[in-house]
Each structure stands twice: as C-alpha cells, then as structure tokens.
Amino acid sequence: CYDLVDGNLVLKGLINPDRSTDTVPYITGGIYTKYKRAFHGGRLEIKAQLGCATGAWPAIWLKPFEEAKYPWPSGGEIDIMEHLNYDSIAYQTVHSTYTHNLNIKKDPPQGSTGPIDPAGYNV
C-alpha cells in the first residue's frame, strides 16, 4: 500500500485483494515506529501532502514508548495531526486521563485546529 515516487513515500488506501485472511474491505499504508524511536523534547517536523477522500483519516500520533506500562488513556496520546475527509483544517488533540476520565477539556484546551493546503505540502 505504498510507493516510492521521486524520493517521496506515497501511502495509499486500496481495496483489499484477499479478504480470506483479513476481512476488512480496504487496506492502507502506514509508518509505525512503535518500539523503534523515542523522543525526549525538541522538535519533530513532518512534511506531508494530505489527499482528500471520503473516509480518509491520515493521522500522526505520539504515544508512550512503553505503552504496555502506560496504557491508554493514562499514558496519553498526542495527535500531532489528524485530517478528515475533505476538511481544509487539521486537528491537534491531547488525550490523557485528565481529558478522558476526568472529562476536563477546556482548561487548558484539549485541542485546536489549523488550516492546511489539501493540494500542497504541509509542515
């Protein structure tokens, strides 16, 4: 579900060609760094072109390195970017025990949105 085109990694969603072993109707490409990379401060910069389609949900999430030790929601999750369908915005959200179990989402704000260029690259 991916191609390398002119030095760009292109992730795709495709109709599942073999539903005998996996019954989901569609399969998608993705990058999973679970147990491969941990970040301790600093800046993470990602350049991505976000296509639009019904049902599309490209996302970039940060989760705990030791997820078994810190399960969701206590370990938290930072949604760096989620783009839905044909929206001209991306969503940024923080999930945690504070926001999920205690339902405190406004002080401080749980998330925000920002404009994107659906036809171009976004950083």
Residue ranges and their predicted role:
Residues 1-123:
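GH16 jelly-roll
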